[in-house]
Amino acid sequence: MHRHTRYTPELALMLGLLLPSAGEAACSRVINVPVAATGQSVIVDGDTIKGIYPDLLRTFTEKDGCTVALSAVPRARLEMLFETGRADLLIPASKTPKRDAYGTFIPLVHNRAMLISIQSGRAPVKTVQELLEQTGVKLALVRGFDYGQAYQSLLATLETQGRVIMEVDALSVARLLKAGTVDATIMAPSIVAGAMMDDERVRDLLDKLRFESLRELPWGNSGAYISNSALGAADKAALQTALERAARSGVVWKGFQQYYAPAVLQGSIRPL
């Protein structure tokens, strides 16, 4: 499962094809994009920000396109910045009704959050109700992650039951799993696997993960939200054009294939 493929010439060519042609409208100012570490989708290594989505966004700076300024923040703060109009883009993000109130969503891939644990003899879990009935199962979740109303309702119930620890990022969750402090988490498998790939303290868990889909957490869309309040109409249109071009090209799905082993993507990420 462990894979360290990175920015290949084939992927670079696909990204290059996304560059705007001469005459297309450029953004009127630098586009402010705070990001949070999200597996291999967004990798924060000191002052360096890289990964599937930073690779994509940097193609928007070429020629007469949009210059993007990336900065690293915790996920919960990222959500707050977007909701208050201080982030021009929220990426990556699953489509949810709450976020729809603040931005225009552009889908880039299909995704699904799953119940993730270390392989064991525990009885299978197929629904939220079954998870709630297994009262001995304690979870760690990332503060700021949102996979829709069913996820939020589950989170509220787990908090009431005292069965959840909220963490700042997926790596912190992975360390709790390894320590046995918690039994499971819920997120897109690529996120927690990506965090494990880049940290030797938890890398040995990669081949021991158990992925289970929950009926109430079906397939949805993941992509980018363009802020409704932070940008003018012309800049919103320019970003929407660039992101929709990326969606049509399939470059984001190709990026996932370059960064992740098939076992991580199966059942949780697929192309549009």
Residue ranges, per PLM feature:
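Extracytoplasmic small-molecule ligand-binding "clamshell" domains
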Residues: 26-101, 166, 259
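Acidic, polar ligand-binding/catalytic clefts
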Residues: 70-133, 144-147, 213-217
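Periplasmic-binding protein-like
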Residues: 35-39, 111-113, 203-240, 262-272
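Ligand-binding cleft/hinge of the Venus flytrap
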Residues: 57-64, 133, 143-167, 174, ...
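Ligand-binding clefts/hinges and TM-proximal coupling segments of bilobed small-molecule sensing domains
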Residues: 67, 144-159, 238-272
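Extended ligand-binding regions for polar small-molecule ligands
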Residues: 54-63, 129-138, 220-257
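A ligand-binding cleft/hinge motif common to bilobed small-molecule-binding domains
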Residues: 77-83, 93-101, 153, 183-208, ...
